[in-house]
Amino acid sequence: MSTDFHALRRGDRLPALAFRVPAGDVRAYLAATGEDVAAWRVSVPPLALGAYILAGLMEEMPLPDGALHGGQEFEFLDAVQQGEPLVAELIVAQQSERQGSNIVVIATELRTASRVVLRGRTTVMAPAAAVTA
C-alpha cells in the first residue's frame, strides 16, 4: 500500500524504511558521482544514504503530477558501515496549502541498532488536489 501525498497531515508517520547499503551499491554510487573509491572502502558516502532514503520515500509515496522537490537538508551525525542495518523513520513535520499548492515537509531520522546517524528534512510541493463532487 502506498501513501497518498495529498492525504498527509502534520504528525503523520510514514512506514519506516529498513535497508542496508551493500558494497556493490557503494561502488555504483562512487562510479556515478566520480568520488574517490579509496576514501569509501568501509563506510557509506553520506549523500548515498540520503539518496537511499529519497528513493524509499518515492517508492512509498509516488508523487502527483507537477510535484517539485523544493528543498533538502541533511545533518550527518556518524559514519555508517557498508552493509550495516538501517531504519529511517519519516514523519510529516509541516503541511500547508498556499496559492494552490500543497507543501509538505518530511522529517527523517536514520538509525542503526544503537545510534542516530542522520537527520534530515525534505520539502515537496505539488498542485493542490482537485476537489471532486
Model-assigned labels for residue ranges:
Residues G71-L77, I91-V92:
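Short structured motifs
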Residues A39-V42, G66, D78-A79, E84, ...:
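Short histidine-centered beta-strand/loop micro-motifs
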Residues A18, E73, R119-T123:
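Well-ordered beta-strand positions in beta-sheet-rich domains
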Residues M1-G71, V131-T132:
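Hot-dog-fold acyl-thioester-processing enzymes
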Residues T3-F5, V80-A133:
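HotDog/MaoC-like acyl-thioester-processing domains
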